[in-house]
């Protein structure tokens, strides 16, 4: 049994603490990140696989950290993105346009790998039989596609027949294609940005110097850690280069968490993985919650041995349907009754929670009845580098 010391008096099993996910909440400076580090230290000491999604770079100096700084020494390989990933990446909500964008990606893959010609895959006057043969040949090819061709390929996806239904289309449905114009502007804007190109490892312009530092596919690291014991190491995915762009940060984290869940579900034999997402409220897409990677792990991850620890400043920052996926809470100081109403199990402890000292927390949930007040251990070597400026 894997046991985690939380305080001088209390040691709990990892199964009891984490198998129903753990939410760590508390006001800024109350000690929630330090508590998360104490738990991760207990897991690492016993060679349990742990990962952190770090929004600010605070955790990159932890001992034995394997640091993947996205946009610097790590990237998300655009060649491996699915149609569903592209829809998330470019913010497509309309189901019809989502389908067209996925089709456009498949078409460009056919053009690159089957037709082996530059440009787009034309669908005007192409027979359905020929298209089905091409699709049948299309498996996972290493040849990348040019995302810059997506706008032109999208137009081909609106080919419609006139009087010959053996072909995909004889003319372009221009009114249908016009619905894609906002998406096309978004694609052109994003794919022309250097930061976007570096993050997704897109081919750089000829006059652009290649990065001097070694770069690693972060999805490879995710698969590596998800399938093996970590040799007392911790994977830190540093998103700090995108801290100024919340929309891009949400997409990055959803792509990472979706890929991690997908990888865990495909592994026949894998190890338990604990994923800490610090300041999780930054990354939750409330309007697209069911497809958000964080929510999907909260709902589906346990069956695959994938367990969440989220830190956030207030339960009000998270949707109720996400809160409902957590069976356990580590609650540092909260100051308002409205916050406590989000977690009914805590309502009788409002005064206690409001007056807790830094580093004190209430451990509550299904396996901790009644809740326990604990003075969390401080592990000096796990001290994260806070970015809060100090007065002088």
Regions found by a protein language model. Name each.
Residues 1-76, 291-294, 320, 363:
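Glycine-rich phosphate-binding loop of nucleotide-binding enzymes
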Residues 10-14, 321, 327-392:
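P-loop NTPase motor core of the ASCE superfamily
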Residues 10-11, 22, 28-30, 241-351:
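Conserved P-loop NTPase motor cores
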Residues 19, 232, 305, 358, ...:
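Active-site lining segments that contact anionic ligands and/or coordinate catalytic metals
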Residues 21-23, 49-51, 232-236, 272-274, ...:
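Residue-level preference for the first positions of well-ordered beta-strands
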Residues 41-42, 57, 61-67, 78-296, ...:
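P-loop NTPase motor domains
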